């Protein structure tokens, strides 16, 4: 009872922090807030914390506090807890696809609502600022502008604030270990889309802001004078130009046409974000930067934690080479490491490339495989083909390689086993997109039947019969009735007319499939190189708190040292200020001094966080790991794919040759076999064409919006769409 009450209090606190931060953004452009905030800053200047401490506490700390409270909340939840299964009252769903477009992807109703609210906020912010500017137009001292030029110049300036709003949210969606999206059960693979949206908005508003400013400077013949100016106080224009150019370069190289063909160009160019953020700080000033700081702060700490984790080495224990040029890699893991189905890891193999990291879905279940973790990759690119060749060489070489060292980051995945909330599951996979469903089916096979979905329909589309070998890791689950999954599998082979081995059923084909199993690791490696995974949520919350206190301490300390303090001689200051003979302490020093203080404080704080993470990592590594052997990690009955014996089954799975799946017909057939009304989770993973086809089906399918609709209709189900695709 006490734990439930604690969770409720934490949830309330998170809502208050989020509402408070959003409210600050809404009231920020109002005249009342501007006047009140100036008075608050004047008062804070005479205190120990100063105006910088006040800005950090009000604008930067709420999102960071939300992250800390969220991590504590997640630490108190049962590990990978199962959400309550939805009933009739939960008929309405916000995951229903509303827009399906090849350029912007698949957008749900909830995402459209959130996007409209954000655009409404931007419109309000822009209107409030511009209307206030037009009421009190002040001429620019260095330029002689007429009325329309002055108005246009003010409008251009305010577009910069819209870019600032996008930048403040830009880095939150790409957090991994410290991601707040997992509180909404939104996976990293899905949240990357929001990063793209915010980045596009940032570049658009920045281009309007910078281009319009350059236009005014050009027509007034001040461009050469203004563009290279590094002002002692105020905005540094050359820094703004640097920020705009680097941001535009990152955006161009992230376009799908460039990113997919030249991933390395995209990857390395994106590291210019450091230059972009530093230039933005010098251009906008410290006061504006406090709004952007939360995302940057959490992203920097998250990056350091990932670097610390990725420095730990693991190894490949065994590999299974399938005839379709797919590889299953088995890695050792700590038995205490648990992860949700559909989780993924980032993998680096120094033997192939020291710098390239690639994401792969985990195909094993931590409920079943306590000592190992498995992934599968399809060899379709240079890096994956190199991995395949290296492992093949290791198998054929007389002097066999004892182990292949790898580095792993993750696992990352949903905070809860979300698919268990549905009464039934409809899974659609295309090619290598089957991988997240392998872990889901293994998880379902290990669960109590009462907690699992009643029926599971898997639609698997491949180009050739050889691609069906990717089903081998779950062959025993598919054909063995003891698992009682009530699984129906429909396989579609689109580019071949008959199998080369003359088989007629899926079971016969898989039984005759050739798999080359290679054991690389020694018995010692099973205990030397286990994957331990990210740190616990509670420890992460503590680390964030330590880091933020370090930042605040150095921010205040360095500011007191380098910026003249006013609170020591308050009476003298008031006399000088009344006579107009004194400028504020902020105006005494160049504007880049507070900016440098923020940078130095940030670097020190992140370094302290990285040092603490390194110490904990070493402590975990030096703890005595439980001894494991090859027999424990790789069970013969699970890994010997070539001895798949025919098992009598009650329902034969279907193979359709030379045709594509007709999803509407399959869904209608699936609905006929349901008893009573139920919620259906529709999960898809595969190429964009497959994802869009499934989304179109869900959008066109009739939907009920309440109990009365259900009574009047003859519908048996509501569809809830989820895409498991990972796209960088």
Curated annotation (Swiss-Prot):
Mark the transmembrane ranges: 56-74, 104-127, 194-217, 269-293, 316-336, 537-559, 595-616
PROSITE patterns, per database record: FAD_FR
Between which residues do disulfide bridges form?
A: none
Record-level GO BP terms: monoatomic ion transport
A GO MF annotation of the entry reads: ferric-chelate reductase activity
**Domain spans labelled FAD-binding FR-type:** 300-418
Q: Which residues form the Ferric oxidoreductase domain?
A: 159-281
Induction profile: Down-regulated in shoots by copper deficiency. Not regulated by iron availability.
* EC number annotated for this UniProt entry: 1.16.1.7
Q: What class of enzyme is it?
A: oxidoreductase
Q: Where is the transit peptide?
A: 1-24
Role noted for this protein = Ferric chelate reductase probably involved in iron reduction in leaf veins for transport. May participate in the transport of electrons to a Fe(3+) ion via FAD and heme intermediates.
- Return the similarity comment: Belongs to the ferric reductase (FRE) family.
Q: What is this protein called?
A: Ferric reduction oxidase 8, mitochondrial
This protein's species is: Arabidopsis thaliana (Mouse-ear cress)
């Amino acid at each position: 009872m006490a734990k439930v009450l604690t969770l409720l209090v934490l949830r309330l606190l998170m809502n208050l922090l989020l509402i408070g931060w959003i409210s600050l953004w809404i009231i920020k452009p109002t005249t009342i807030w501007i006047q009140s905030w100036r008075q608050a800053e004047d008062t804070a200047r005479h205190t120990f914390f100063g105006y910088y401490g006040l800005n950090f506490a009000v604008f930067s700390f709420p999102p960071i506090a939300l992250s800390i409270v969220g991590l504590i909340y997640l630490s108190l939840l049962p590990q990978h807890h199962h959400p309550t299964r939805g009933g009739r009252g939960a008929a309405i769903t916000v995951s229903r696809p509303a827009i399906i477009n090849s350029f912007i992807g698949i957008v749900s109703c909830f995402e459209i609502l959130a996007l409209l609210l954000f655009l409404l906020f931007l419109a309000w912010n822009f209107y409030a600022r511009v209307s206030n500017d037009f009421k009190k137009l002040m001429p620019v001292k260095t330029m002689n502008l007429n009325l329309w030029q002055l108005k246009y110049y003010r409008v251009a300036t305010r577009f910069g604030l819209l870019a600032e709003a996008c930048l403040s949210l830009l880095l939150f969606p790409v957090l991994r270990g410290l991601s707040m999206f997992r509180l909404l059960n939104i996976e990293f693979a899905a949240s990357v889309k929001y990063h793209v949206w915010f980045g596009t908005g940032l570049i658009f508003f920045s281009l309007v802001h910078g281009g319009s400013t350059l236009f005014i400077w050009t027509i007034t013949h001040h461009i050469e004078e203004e563009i290279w100016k590094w002002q002692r106080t105020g905005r540094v224009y050359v820094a703004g130009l640097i920020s705009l150019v680097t941001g535009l370069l990152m955006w161009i190289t992230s376009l799908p046409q460039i990113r997919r063909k030249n991933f390395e160009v995209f990857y390395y160019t994106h590291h210019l974000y450091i230059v972009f953020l530093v230039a933005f700080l010098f251009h906008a000033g410290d006061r504006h930067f406090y709004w952007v700081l939360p995302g940057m702060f959490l992203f920097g700490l998250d990056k350091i934690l990932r670097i610390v984790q990725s420095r730990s080495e693991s190894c490949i224990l065994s590999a299974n080479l399938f005839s379709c040029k797919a590889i299953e890699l088995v890695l050792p893991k700590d038995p205490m490491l648990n992860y949700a189905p559909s989780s993924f890891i980032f993998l680096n193999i120094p033997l192939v490339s020291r710098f390239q990291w690639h994401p792969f879905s985990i195909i094993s279940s931590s409920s079943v495989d306590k000592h190992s973790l498995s992934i599968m990759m399809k060899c379709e690119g240079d890096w994956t083909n190199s991995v395949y060749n290296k492992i093949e060489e290791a198998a054929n070489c007389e002097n066999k390689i004892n182990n292949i060292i790898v580095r792993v980051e993750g696992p990352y995945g949903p905070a809860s086993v979300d698919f268990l909330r549905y009464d039934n599951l409809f899974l659609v996979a295309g090619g290598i997109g089957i991988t997240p469903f392998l872990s889901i089916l293994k998880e379902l096979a290990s669960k109590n039947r009462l907690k699992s979905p009643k029926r599971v329909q898997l639609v698997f589309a491949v180009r050739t019969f050889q691609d069906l070998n990717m089903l081998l890791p779950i062959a025993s689950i598919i054909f063995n009735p003891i698992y009682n999954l009530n699984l129906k599998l429909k396989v579609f082979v689109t580019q071949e007319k008959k199998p080369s081995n003359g088989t007629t059923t899926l079971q016969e084909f898989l039984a005759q499939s050739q798999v080359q199993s290679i054991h690389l690791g020694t018995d010692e490696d099973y205990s030397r190189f286990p994957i331990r995974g990210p740190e616990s949520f509670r420890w992460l919350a503590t680390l964030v708190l330590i880091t933020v206190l370090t930042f605040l301490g150095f921010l205040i300390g360095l500011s007191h040292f380098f910026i003249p303090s006013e609170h020591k001689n308050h009476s003298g200051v008031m006399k000088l200020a009344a006579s107009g003979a004194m400028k504020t302490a902020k105006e005494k020093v160049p504007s880049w001094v507070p900016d440098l203080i923020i940078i130095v404080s940030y670097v020190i704080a992140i370094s302290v966080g990285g040092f603490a993470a390194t110490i904990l990592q070493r402590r975990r590594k030096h703890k005595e790991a439980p001894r494991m052997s090859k027999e424990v990690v790789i069970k013969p009955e699970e890994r010997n794919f070539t001895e798949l014996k025919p098992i009598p089954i009650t329902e034969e799975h279907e193979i359709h040759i030379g045709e594509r799946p007709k999803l509407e017909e399959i869904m209608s057939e699936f609905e006929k076999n349901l008893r009573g009304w139920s919620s259906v989770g529709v999960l898809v993973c595969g190429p964009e064409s497959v994802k869009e086809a499934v989304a179109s089906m869900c959008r066109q399918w009739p939907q009920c919006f309440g109990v009365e609709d259900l009574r009047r209709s003859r519908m048996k189900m509501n569809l809830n769409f989820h895409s498991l695709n990972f796209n960088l």
